[in-house]
Amino acid sequence: MEYNPPNTRERIVARRQRMRRNSTEPVVPGWRWRLREGLRSGRIVSGIVFVISCFALFYVLFSSRFRVQTVEVVGAEFLSPERIVAAVPLRGLPIWLVDEEQAVAPLLTSPFVEEARLTLSLPDRARIVIVERQPAIYWRTGGVDYLVDRQGYVIEAAATPPAEDELVIVDSSNLPVEPGMRLDTDALTLARELAFVLPNQIGLHPAQIGWDFGLGVFVRTAQDQMIVFGRSERLERKLTILAYLLADGTPFTYLDLRPVNPFYQYRPDGSS
């Protein structure tokens, strides 16, 4: 029987190498330790809050509860609320994604609308406030009377003739006019001023207040006199000269107050 001496030295070396390898391998912590560490550092709580926030944000953005359902229109007189709602299609849109200024922009293209505002209220309400143009003057051209607001914007052709006390400016040039067009604001301001000042301060009651492309604003009297004011500059001086001529009894059929040195003509036959 053959005897194999034990290789003690080699076994010791092999054992030491195994121990050295085991000591260099990283220690993998268990799930309990990882859970305790996550709770202690707040990472788990932060993750839970983040997930809940994502779900809440998704719900708020896309839930039907936060989509516009009710649209209220305030201030509409000429325009029907139904037409306004149709022009601003808000129903069904997520309330968070509605641009208030852009939404009402189509309304501002209407000749009836001077101002439009949109306010949103959670969870599903929209309120449109309309400031409509109010007719202040009639502008007559080509035999048609148009309603004009104080800013000079043409609203529409008048459905009924103006009343006796309404201010009507007659365009002797017969220039074409359409809704939404803005007229000469200086001419409108001057015409309103003359309609008040002439009868109340000078005692002259105009038979007609008109406008001409070349002359500007003019007035015709019951005696078939034509008084040209042009524009509103130096209005006080023009009124003073007119008042003096009327008080003096100076006869004239045509008076031009536009030049620095106004002039007048008197032709009983009415020609100028």
Curated annotation (Swiss-Prot):
Q: Which PROSITE patterns match?
A: POTRA
Topological domains, Cytoplasmic: 1-43
Keyword Cell inner membrane attached: no
Q: Which residues lie on this side of the membrane: Extracellular?
A: 65-272
- Protein localization: Cell membrane
Tell me, what's a Pfam family for it?
FtsQ_DivIB_C
Name all POTRA domain ranges: 66-133
- Name this polypeptide is given: Cell division protein FtsQ
